[in-house]
Regions:
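Metal- or metallocofactor-binding catalytic centers and their adjacent structured scaffolds
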Residues: 6-77
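Glycine- and other small-residue-rich loops at beta-strand/loop junctions that grip anionic moieties
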Residues: 12, 63, 101, 135-138, ...
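Metal-dependent enolase-superfamily TIM-barrel catalytic cores that perform enediolate-based chemistry
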Residues: 93-205
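Shared catalytic-loop signature of beta/alpha-barrel
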Residues: 21, 25, 29, 177, ...
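Conserved, mostly hydrophobic/aromatic
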Residues: 5, 27, 66, 79, ...
Length: 277
């Protein structure tokens, strides 16, 4: 809240009750009375003050929420959208994709895909229903799901596959050869985010581009992923990685490595970062 009563709205990505406690007990006193336009200084102040416990998880989510509020406040004070403060528009429109298509009976899955197709979507992301504990039968069922969606959306549209950390390296290496024929744009989070060597190995296969970063919490974490060529698409969320201040730097870093950024979730803070990158 500014002296004149203008308010900035932030957003906590996960565990909002716990994040609020962290903000109230540790973070808010670091920024109260400060100039919001000193956002770089404020970000560094929060980061260094919580380094022992806050570099990932709740601490960084709290920093993200405050930083998003600061940028929203700056935009309102200057009467400009945040993307203009970041350098302005770089594109006329932001491409979007339909992101649901969870595991369900084949007919229902195809009806849902047809619905998105009729709504005008050209890109689709779907989920799997089975993992390592389900063995070869689970692999077969997963393939049937992908085939069902491809039958509806065709090969002129993009299809992305989301495993949501549900596999391990061994399982991923078994199923990927079965998925190649469906020409997916990417395979998202096949293994847990801590298995960076697994991401490196899968991405180096070159069979299907690997996407990740939804559960990464820092600029330095993405720097590590990019240096190791662990992913072909990065998917940060500004309300997890340190807000607009960190997200803008991650965009620049990804440009250096020529790796596309596809932010996680269609939330306003991610739209502004995408419009300015």
């Amino acid at each position: 809240i500014a002296d004149d009563g203008t308010t900035g709205l932030g957003n906590a990505a996960l565990a909002p009750e716990v994040t609020k406690k962290a903000i109230d007990c540790y973070l808010k006193d670091l920024v109260i009375g400060e100039d919001p336009f000193d956002y770089e200084y404020l970000w560094e102040k929060m980061y260094r003050s919580t380094m022992a416990w806050g570099r990932k998880g709740i601490g960084m989510i709290g920093i993200s929420a405050i930083d998003l509020g600061i940028w929203d406040l700056m935009g309102k004070i200057q009467k400009k959208p945040v993307f203009e403060l970041l350098g302005g528009r770089t594109k006329e429109k932001i491409p979007v994709y339909a992101s649901k298509l969870y595991s369900q009976p084949i007919k229902d899955l195809q009806i849902e895909a047809e619905k998105y197709l009729k709504e005008g979507f050209k890109m689709f992301k779907m989920r799997f229903g089975w993992g390592p504990k389900d063995g070869s039968d689970g692999i077969k069922k997963n393939i049937e799901l992908v085939n069902a969606v491809r039958e509806v959306v065709g090969y002129d549209n993009d299809l992305m596959l989301e495993a949501y950390m549900g596999w391990n390296l061994e399982y991923s290496k078994k199923i990927i050869p079965e998925l190649i024929k469906f020409k997916p744009k990417w395979l998202e989070e096949p293994v847990i985010p801590d298995d960076i060597p697994g991401y490196v190995e899968l991405n180096s296969l070159g069979d299907i581009p690997i996407a990740g970063g939804e559960h990464e919490f820092s600029f330095l974490g993405f720097k590590h992923l990019l240096e190791l060529k662990a992913v072909s698409y990065i998917q940060y969320d500004a309300n997890r990685v340190g807000g607009i201040t960190a997200g803008h730097k991650i965009n620049s870093l990804a440009e250096k490595y020529d790796v596309p950024v596809v932010p996680h979730a269609g939330q306003m803070h991610n739209y502004h970062l995408t419009m300015a990158s």
